[in-house]
């Protein structure tokens, strides 16, 4: 790649030196070849591979001077469209404008995206946007699940009122004991009497939440094992609600971000809207006047002549521009071609042109010699 780049630069330097000797009359050979290639491009065609005569990545075309107006071929005259609409032009240029020929951004130095398709001026390729939306969807689903789990756990299994009121006790069992190997029995008092509760070391227990003599488990946790104090349980309760709020916020932001990326993926560059191909002319048919009007081809101030019975596609090539549109069919009482004024260019001889075509369902006028 480095050797090819050096050869292209040496070729450009030799051509610049030769152009200076000849007074700047000749154009650069490689630039004229690229302009000729640009003039024969088709906007919607995509080729399978790169062009064989393209310069390597990082050539001197990024700083190429602006080509003169007379050097631009007829195929690209007046069009400031980007040449990156074809995959074969990806390794050559990004755009052709009065300012010059610009190399594609993928072939600037330190670029690692030289093999992707050209996306016509988008911020990122469509695949990147689609992958981002998919990963954001996974994050949105995960945030929703975490918010549900944290909120349900904090709301149903932790009762903060006895903890905040100081009605829970902490049992440590002394130093050197682990909470899973040392157990003791404590006495809890309730409305039904008193009962014995086995607790482990480093446990915060609440007798108000423990149902003495009941075989059904308590809906709320009455003991918390492996804490340093009962205040740690209060902190855990607050952290669960903070995690729920953050997960809900991440859920909303993920949905909004996915929507914005979807909008960016479907955006069209402003250059395509400004310099895109013009739409085909619309054909408007008025059954009352039997006239085919071609919008976009005829000026609105042009009058409709009365001496021609040929529509626009059937006019002879030598006809004047004033006869661009005419009646499709003539009734019996209308003026015949032999009654036209001589100043309008009509002759009494039969017209050598082909008769007009009529729309389906319409009756042609009778033959008049």
UniProtKB/Swiss-Prot annotation:
Pfam family of the protein (one): FAM70
Bias (Low complexity) ranges: 318-329
Keyword set includes Transmembrane: yes
Protein name (record): Transmembrane protein 255B
InterPro entries: TMEM255 (IPR028014)
Major location category of this protein: membrane
Record keywords: Membrane, Transmembrane, Transmembrane helix
């Amino acid at each position: 790649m480095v050797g090819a780049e050096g050869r292209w630069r040496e070729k450009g330097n030799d051509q610049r030196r030769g152009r200076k000797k000849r007074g700047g009359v000749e154009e650069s050979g490689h630039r004229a070849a690229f302009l000729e290639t640009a003039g024969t491009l088709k906007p919607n065609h995509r080729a399978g591979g790169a062009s064989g005569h393209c310069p390597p990545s990082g050539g001197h075309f990024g700083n190429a001077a602006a080509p003169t107006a007379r050097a631009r071929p007829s195929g690209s005259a007046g069009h400031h469209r980007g040449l990156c609409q074809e995959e074969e032009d990806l390794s050559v240029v990004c755009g052709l404008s009065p300012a010059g020929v610009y190399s594609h951004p993928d072939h600037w130095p330190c670029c690692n995206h030289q093999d992707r398709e050209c996306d016509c001026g988008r911020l990122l390729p469509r695949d990147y946007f689609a992958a981002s939306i998919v990963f954001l969807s996974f994050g949105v689903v995960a945030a929703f699940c975490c918010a549900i789990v944290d909120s349900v756990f904090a709301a149903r299994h932790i009762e903060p009122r006895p903890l905040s009121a100081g009605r829970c006790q902490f049992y440590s069992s002394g130093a050197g004991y682990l909470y899973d190997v040392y157990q003791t029995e404590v006495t809890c008092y309730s409305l039904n009497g008193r009962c014995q509760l086995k607790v482990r070391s480093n446990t915060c227990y609440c007798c108000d939440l423990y149902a003495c003599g009941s075989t059904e488990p308590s809906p709320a946790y009455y003991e918390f094992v492996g804490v340093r104090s009962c205040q740690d349980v209060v902190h855990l309760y607050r952290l669960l609600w903070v995690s729920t709020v953050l997960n809900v916020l991440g859920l909303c932001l993920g949905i909004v971000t996915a929507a914005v990326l979807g909008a960016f993926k479907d955006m069209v560059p402003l250059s395509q809207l400004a310099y895109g191909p013009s739409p085909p002319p619309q054909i408007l048919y008025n059954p009352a006047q039997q006239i085919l009007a071609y919008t976009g081809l005829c000026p609105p101030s042009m009058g409709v002549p009365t001496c021609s019975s040929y529509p626009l596609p059937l006019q002879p090539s030598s006809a004047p521009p004033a006869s661009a549109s005419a009646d499709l069919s003539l009734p019996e009482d209308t003026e015949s071609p032999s009654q036209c004024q001589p100043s309008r260019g009509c002759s009494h001889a039969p017209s050598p042109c082909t008769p007009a075509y009529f729309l389906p369902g319409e009756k042609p006028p009778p033959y008049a010699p």
